[in-house]
Amino acid sequence: PCPLTSGPESESAQEFGRYQCAFPDIEKMKTLITSVQPGDSDNREAVAAHMYFPRLFTYEFVRSDDSNETNGLLNYGYSLVMSEVARKIAEFGYLTEFGIHHDSEKNPFNLACDLMEPFRPFVDAKVFELREQTLNSEVKNELIRLLRTDLPEFGTSLTQLINIFVRDAFHYLSGDDRLPELGFIDEV
């Protein structure tokens, strides 16, 4: 068990404490995250994910277990974010079928799958809050509201942040030298 703090700053301190307790080997994960190379030939992203999900939820948690309620929550949340990203891609006049890393002929949303990756932690954090819930209409509405949630650290909503990121990604892919950033690595 990991002790949580109390006091005037208790809510944010407790939230930090929960994540700190969930990730006692956070330094190892940071090293893995920052050492992922283009193409990830040594599979470091998968190793980090294998460490991440069991620590966030329970050590018995397996991401591929479709019978697990938490996986249902994650899948629903990710599909909402992917849909929003796909909508923005189409809004900017691009096709969702042609991805950068995702390239399945059976996936009509390859590019959306590529560009949604930085937003998965928002879903993960919300599902962490809802982890004791079952996927019903009330919980689905909670996950839908996540898209409109204000993110004080970014000064905007998640939907608007997705819009900015997709726009900046297309500027970069069109030859702009500035790579879009959200700043997640610095905050890990």
Report the location of each language-model feature.
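Active-site helix-to-loop segments that bind/position phosphate- or nucleotide-bearing substrates
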Residues: 1-188
